[in-house]
Amino acid sequence: MAPVLPAATPDRRLGMLDVLRLLAALSVVAFHFTARHSPGWDGPVPDALAPVGQWTAYGRMGVPLFFVISGFVLLMTAWGRDVPRFVASRVGRLYPAYWVAAAFSILLVLVAWPANPAFLGREITTSDALLNLTMVQGAFGVPDVDGSFWTLWYELRFYLLIVLLMLVGITRRRVLAFCTLWPIAGAIVQGQESRLLSVLLMPDYAPFFAGGMLLYLLHRDGHDLGTWLLVGLQALFALDFSMGYYPAALAEETPWAPSAAAIALGTAACFGLVALVTLTPLAGRSARWMTVAGALTYPLYLVHENLGWFVIHLLRERIGPWGAVLVAVVVALLAATALHHLVERRVSGRLRAATLRMLQPAAGAARGGTPAVAPVPRPAGEPATVSLTAVLPETLVRHSGYGRHRVADPPGAHDAGPRIPAGR
């Protein structure tokens, strides 16, 4: 089977994936500023925003789009890399910007604007705020000091699953089996009320992560029917979740009754857009501005919510709703730019190197010379396609109970430089 793209150099970037990530972040920004009930507006958004807000409400689905991108990028990052380097790259990428953004939000909600958490129904204590600096506050049921932070707990759990897969050894067959069985296993343990496994397996958003991983296999190895059918299966699982969750969530958080058709289309778009920018000639597009777009995505996601709402709260009566929204967007973009240049570019590399120095001796002793990642090439004679019956037992589908969702209260963050690997 011919590869999707010609062999590329390691330095060739997936520029359009960077752009898609920024668009996903901007869709979430638009949802928060122009559609969601918020302390910025002291309730529902003004009527002046309604013509736009009834559409930007679906920007909330930028979060599952982030998760599909996560599945793609994290598998690409982990393949061929050992566990210490993978963990160090994640720590260096996520934490510097997060610590600064979390510290800012702590000062804002505890000192400058306590009406913010009061409006959102959160009681945030000093100890809760400090636990937020770890990024694992969700594991302890502690409120996030910034509403956008909830997605990072999902990301961390996905990283853990990737590490477990790396320890077993990443091969094409194992990734196919993992992506097939993960959402089904999650649905089974959810139906049995197994709290620990349900938290680990994330039944609600697992199909989005798994779908992104499968799209990376298609990008890496080329088109084949079996993998495409598995992508379709993940999309169906994701649609089942979306139709059971987003109508009620959007009706509660916005003044408008959502359209089921729009939610279904948004769910399909999460997979379709990632496929479009990675499996077509668009994947070959690259430019400096695309790199900048990717670099700003994570810091923008981190800082926009509380900061933007605070700006809207201060300016809405003075310059009107649209003026306040425009200023809030500009301020959020400026803050994201500062966070990237002053924190990420100066600290991320140092933290990554320090983490790697700490992890490598322990990993070397535990590994005893055994590589953490299995060889990439398939065995001779192994077909490029995969039989669904080999990885998807019929009884699991029949008895999975998929659809009985108990969803966590609602919305990622990755390397700004996804690259096209050479010699797929």
Predicted regions and their residues:
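Alpha-helical transmembrane segments in multi-pass integral membrane proteins
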Residues: A2-M16, A30-W55, M76-G80, P84, ...
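Small-polar-interrupted transmembrane alpha-helices in polytopic inner-membrane proteins
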Residues: A25-H32, V175-G191, V231-L236
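Acidic/Ser-Thr/Pro-Gly-rich, low-complexity N-terminal segments
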Residues: M1, R367-R424
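Membrane-interface helix-loop-helix regions
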Residues: R36-M61, I69, L94-L160, A185-I188, ...
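Hydrophobic alpha-helical transmembrane segments of polytopic
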Residues: L17-A24, V28, T56, V63, ...
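Hydrophobic alpha-helical segments with transmembrane-like composition
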Residues: F66, V73-G80, G92-L94, L131-Q192, ...
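Membrane-proximal cytoplasmic C-terminal regulatory module of class A 7TM GPCRs
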Residues: R346-P379
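Transmembrane alpha-helical segments and their boundary/interface "anchor" motifs
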Residues: A24, R60-P64, M76-V111, L131, ...
